[in-house]
Amino acid sequence: MCSSDLLTAEDVRRLLELEPNATCGFVRITYASGQSIAAGGLPVPFDDVRPLGSALYFMVTPTAPVRLHRIRNDQLYHYYLGDPLEVFMLHKDGSTGRVVVGPDLRGGERVQLFIPGNTFHTARLIGRRRWFLGASTEWPGVEPADVEIGNLDALAAKYPLVAGDLRSIAASVRPN
């Protein structure tokens, strides 16, 4: 038995000093590049100074899923510990994607998932442990203005094949 098998969600939150987050369960920013890109050095919509990249831990629980949102930046999800995470992506062309981020490579899960910038996405746990610990790396570095919460009704209408999943995940979000 691995020592991580004995961890609870509360242990992970405490040990990694994770704080509640409006979009991604519980979060702690772990890196923002000390090097930056000057204003005007990136394509639209990035019009201000940006770190080259950023990274954060995030933990998802049944009542703190990844809310329906998008960020301007490309991002890469990484699996670390706990349950797999079922991620729903809503692509600009009207198609959808469903990918499970987790440890079961033989079962088709991935330990990394690329999410293109401006892709609405949401996620929920699948599994028995009731928590997921992962990370997200982004480039350029994310600023609060880069994050947009999705309009559930509008996106459910545009993506009817996953509307039930979107509503189910949204219903589990803890009150702020």
Q: Predicted regions: what is each one?
A:
Residues M1-S3:
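Short, small-residue-biased leader/transition segments that mark boundaries at the very start
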